[in-house]
Amino acid sequence: MKIVADQNIPALSDLLSGAGTLSYFSERIPPQKLLAEADALLVRSVTQVDEVLLEQAPELKFVASATIGTEHINLQALEERGIGFAHAPGANAQSVGEYVLCAVLNWLSDQPRYVADEIDVAIVGAGHTGKAAGKRLEALGLNVHYYDPPLCKKGVKFVHDHWQRVLTADIISCHVPLTRDGDFPTQHLFENTALQSLHSQQLLINASRGAVIDNNALLERVEQGERPSLVLDVWENEPEVLSGLVPYVDIATPHIAGHSLEGKVGGAVMISNALLEHFGKPADKTLSDVLPGKAWNERDAGGLNSLESLNLWAKEHYDLFRDDELFRQQGLTTEGFDSLRRNYRKESPRREFINQVVTCHNSEQYIQFLQLGFSARLLSK
């Protein structure tokens, strides 16, 4: 079996050892020579698997994407050709949740005074990443609600479909797939009218897909002044970035919210097992089989009993502003944007907060830090 894979999907040589011949590609589109003989193709969201690509891959039997989204895959074309498909929903959810947590901690630290349960948070999209973000913000004591009309239509109880409630929230965090049709399209969900309604006391976060927010309309809005605080990890038309928008964004990053080591390796494990299963081979690899050991670091909860101390500790383990600085320096060209994603923290991979242990003195602390995504240890009395 000949397997063609994006070179930035980690651990494949270990996960697929003995499964076949593994060849890598480094650009967005695999070389025609590799496609011509490929039995399986493993991609990231930067590769468009469309009719043009599939015409070059007559032997292809299986495609997988190491991502949660599928908008870069022509699923109908795969089905018509009898080509199997898999992706990795939820693999990077904890990583995205931590990105949002760090962004919100930073924003809250700049608020002169606030009462936690009076901060209204709208999570737009109640899938894996939305729930991971929401759980962490609930652990801060914030008032979190979930906007998800498709789930609401199905009768799911913990979501709502009140758009105005979203637009009036103090914090809005986007976690939806990019859809262009159907009953609830998300492309330009935040268009001119919605963006004009936002004000300077709000925080808008997008860690889903760039085109969920109309970037040109957003630029028009922020140029008017009294803008909301902005955290953008994704950009419409990326790797091209609307450069005029960047100076108005408080935290700007190159689509790396989900790029923790655990998130990337987790996606690789999911699609590798799916590939092996598709071809009738044993598929029993786990994250612990290929992930480096945890970098344990212990901290007493008593030293984390304020927002300031928690924010500072979170920054020690994931400093958003390091990624923001590199993006502003290098990410405003298509080549620079792709390079930042491709080479993201290669020398010192970003590890998730679960590697950090918080020693807790009561059950309330224990539950809170587990919800925040840390490991926790409850001292016995």
Curated annotation (Swiss-Prot):
Pfam families the UniProt entry points to: 2-Hacid_dh, 2-Hacid_dh_C, DUF3410
Q: Predominant location of this chain?
A: cytoplasm
**Top class in the EC scheme:** oxidoreductase
Cellular component annotations (GO), alphabetically ordered: cytoplasm
**Which keywords belong to this entry?**
Cytoplasm, NAD, Oxidoreductase, Pyridoxine biosynthesis
| InterPro entries, sorted | D-isomer_2-hydroxyacid_DH (IPR050223), D-isomer_2_OHA_DH_cat_dom (IPR006139), D-isomer_DH_NAD-bd (IPR006140), Erythronate-4-P_DHase (IPR020921), Erythronate-4-P_DHase_dimer (IPR024531), NAD(P)-bd_dom_sf (IPR036291), PdxB_dimer_sf (IPR038251)
Q: Which Gene3D superfamilies match?
A: 3.30.1370.170, NAD(P)-binding Rossmann-like Domain
Q: Where does NAD(+) bind?
A: D148, A207, S208, R209, D233, G258
Function per UniProt = Catalyzes the oxidation of erythronate-4-phosphate to 3-hydroxy-2-oxo-4-phosphonooxybutanoate.
Which PANTHER family would you find in this protein's record? Answer: 2-HYDROXYACID DEHYDROGENASE-RELATED
So what family is this one in? Belongs to the D-isomer specific 2-hydroxyacid dehydrogenase family. PdxB subfamily.
Protein's name according to its UniProt entry: Erythronate-4-phosphate dehydrogenase
Q: Which organism is it from?
A: Idiomarina loihiensis (strain ATCC BAA-735 / DSM 15497 / L2-TR)
